[in-house]
Amino acid sequence: MVEHVPFKLKSEFEPQGDQPQAIQKIVDGVNEGKRHQTLLGATGTGKTFTMSNVIKEVGKPTLIIAHNKTLAGQLYSEFKEFFPENRVEYFVSYYDYYQPEAYVPSTDTFIEKDASINDEIDQLRHSATSSLFERDDVIIIASVSCIYGLGNPEEYKNLVVSVRVGMEMERSELLRKLVDVQYSRNDIDFQRGTFRVRGDVVEIFPASREEMCIRVEFFGDEIDRIREVNYLTGEVIREREHFTIFPASHFVTREEKMKVAIERIEKELEERLKELRDENKLLEAQRLEQRTNYDLEMMREMGFCSGIENYSVHLTLRPLGSTPYTLLDYFGDDWLVMIDESHVTLPQIRGMYNGDRARKQVLIDHGFRLPSALDNRPLKFEEFEEKTKQLVYVSATPGPYELEHTDEMVEQIIRPTGLLDPKIDVRPTENQIDDLLSEIQDRVDKDERVLVTTLTKKMSEDLTTYMKEAGIKVNYLHSEIKTLERIEIIRDLRMGTYDAIVGINLLREGIDIPEVSLVVILDADKEGFLRSDRSLIQTIGRAARNDKGEVIMYADKITDSMQYAIDETQRRREIQIAHNKEHGITPKTINKKIHDVISATVESDETNQQQQTELPKKMTKKERQKTIENIEKEMKKAAKDLDFEKATELRDMLFELKAEG
């Protein structure tokens, strides 16, 4: 039985500006059963706070989808703060590193699946699915991995092991049930997904918990006592009358179903081998027979095998080609989906299926997998649409899909800080570089910063060189710059080491810099992805964190995209100015703390204190290994503290260090 718990929003702020009307409109829309709604929220208007208020008012389990792990991590931290008493969960891919299995026919190279699984994220995924079966006050922040195949939710729910004080049950029966749901006995290395036995006491470490295990004490053939215990210290946290243990894997199957699944796999193998041999693909047939029989043997003996997800269509006894189960199936009938940065996230959801299919088809053609492996896949976009009932799209620049499916945009234009969208000035390209240098110098004199966006790498490089020769402290930000260096450049811009940054695509997250008072768009009239109306509005938004924010577009004609961006920005400015005037608000630049660059933590032998250090350019093998260990330690600590941004940056540093080694 799912427990009903109301959402309790904790915040020192009340909705202000146009947040109250946005909240009310979306809540009314959800209650009226509207399928599609769009929150058009300008940069810095508090969209997350509005989303939180909607969830509180509507009171439905909610799935929030973000387009990458970093963004999902930021949202998870924010929603945890807003809803400390409710179940806020995190569901992203549990791979720190993932190389899917693949085959390159031209070089006859098979690449084995190689992955580094993050145990903490695996625990959070289990916590998310089990929460949905226990309570209805659940918010799950997910990346697009939520549309990838997961086990059958009915099977997952039906296979739970329920223990209650006073229940008649032999100890051996509990152990057998735990093994059936893929827990393994380990009396020495006690960790998630294992249990240990000490006389009449069985201790179970649930897959969904981080530091708490369950101690079940027997008296004869009866459960005498159940307690929650800290697995490290042994300290008793609390007594329990009842506890539900969810399976240790989402791909869990009853024994009788496993037998049927194995028969189905054998039948498919037989048919596929005949096909391959008829086509005279003898090497492929031999390879497939060998690999599949090994997997079948593992399933018979262990109930599991490496890459078991490739047999998911058989394990769940679904017809070939049918829609896979995903996280979406773990929600009940009445729930809500919010898609953050929908103009980026929706195209990502749409594109997942085709990319996955192309890679798997090569493996099937060359005898590495059975054709049914195609059914272990992400959802097609049409299937995603079928499975979701009510959606709220959140974006500063909604895409064509949102515009087409939403009757009326819910606008949120006013910033709590009173900051306005920037003024836009269109200037001719003649003498544009000299004019640009003069504008930058003007900002330098006022201790302000500048972002310059160009269309090509060559233009960026040439412009950076020219500006350096003219005495301007400038750096160039491009896609080949590694994560750590990128963070350093942005920090140095804020600190004043640089006056300006030149780049091609400055829309990536992490470029919200309050010190930037001028954004310059070169070649604004060259139509294309980087100069579309949505891209221009996003770029203009980079100057909306400063009360002196201004945008200069250099162009010889005004394109439709430019006109739309200019008109939209002016419309928003007028709304913001009117609101500030009515309420006596003076716009104020955001004061954002400048963080030190994340760098390797080195322990000083004398003081044993942690200190920040720049990564040396050259290191011995031993120094590199020590640095890697320190960064790994710091990364895990950051993840534990829910500082996912920092953890992600440290992870990228690790990849760079390992690649260089």
Swiss-Prot record:
- Binding residues for ATP: 41-48
Q: Where is the Helicase C-terminal domain?
A: 432-598
GO MF, one annotated term = ATP hydrolysis activity
Superkingdom field: Bacteria
Q: Which PROSITE patterns match?
A: HELICASE_ATP_BIND_1, HELICASE_CTER, UVR
Residue ranges constituting the UVR domain according to the UniProt record = 625-660
Motif segment (Beta-hairpin): 94-117
According to its UniProt entry, one GO biological process term is: nucleotide-excision repair
| Alphabetical list of InterPro entries matching this protein | Helicase/UvrB_N (IPR006935), Helicase_ATP-bd (IPR014001), Helicase_C-like (IPR001650), P-loop_NTPase (IPR027417), UVR_dom (IPR001943), UVR_dom_sf (IPR036876), UvrB (IPR004807), UvrB_inter (IPR041471)
Q: Which UniProt keywords apply?
A: ATP-binding, Cytoplasm, DNA damage, DNA excision, DNA repair, Excision nuclease, Nucleotide-binding, SOS response
Q: Region (Disordered): which ranges? A: 603-624
One Gene Ontology cellular component annotation held by this UniProt entry: excinuclease repair complex
Write out the annotated subcellular location. Answer: Cytoplasm
Please report the stretch or stretches of sequence annotated as the Helicase ATP-binding domain. Answer: 28-414
Free-text comment on this protein's domains from its UniProt entry: The beta-hairpin motif is involved in DNA binding.
Complex formation: Forms a heterotetramer with UvrA during the search for lesions. Interacts with UvrC in an incision complex.
Q: Which family does it belong to?
A: Belongs to the UvrB family.
What NCBIfam families does the entry give? PRK05298.1 (NF003673), uvrb (TIGR00631)
**PANTHER family from the UniProt entry:** UVRABC SYSTEM PROTEIN B (PTHR24029:SF0)
Protein purpose:
The UvrABC repair system catalyzes the recognition and processing of DNA lesions. A damage recognition complex composed of 2 UvrA and 2 UvrB subunits scans DNA for abnormalities. Upon binding of the UvrA(2)B(2) complex to a putative damaged site, the DNA wraps around one UvrB monomer. DNA wrap is dependent on ATP binding by UvrB and probably causes local melting of the DNA helix, facilitating insertion of UvrB beta-hairpin between the DNA strands. Then UvrB probes one DNA strand for the presence of a lesion.
Q: What is the name of the protein in this document? A: UvrABC system protein B
